Amino acid sequence: MNKKIYLLPLLLLALIFVSCEETKEAGKYDNWKARGEMFIDSIAAEAAAQTEQTPIAERIYSVLDQVNRNYIYYKKNIDYPPTSNVSPLYTDSVVTNYRMSYFNGDIVQQTFTGKDPDGFSKPVGFTVDKVISGWTWALQQMKVGERWTLYIPWKSGYGSATGPSGDLQPYSTLVYDVQL
């Protein structure tokens, strides 16, 4: 009987230690690649579900990345209509304002702050064929003056790399706010 009295407190003590074990919280970038792919899949499903009655401001368009064989999705900002009927060619130089963010909304790079580009913006110039393939294929569809939101899968972005300056998460699905 005496042994049974000691067993109960020992059992309770063991349960307390087991129940106090810390659980690991999910990190901000856990399952990053899979989450990014699910985000693009949701954009693709939204694009596929569109009808002729879908308002122009809500339409999602797509262009095939001829290099990586996946689709780049984009929305046109109707508040920024084209100022010209000209679209850049593969070897053309362009000037853009842009904001690059992860699919979770974290801003990574930008040439403007605030909601819209303004006189304090610092647009950048580059050759269309010298940027990530997602940009290359989307830019060739844009007209001068337009502003689009691009949804770029990781394969058409920086892939498994961390970007030119090493500050990107590998396998990042990217969202760009671009004005040509």
Language model regions located:
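Cross-family detector of peptidyl-prolyl cis-trans isomerase
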Residues: N2-I5, C20-L180
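Sec-dependent N-terminal signal peptides
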Residues: Y6-L12
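Extreme N-terminal targeting and regulatory segments of eukaryotic proteins
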Residues: L12-L13, K24
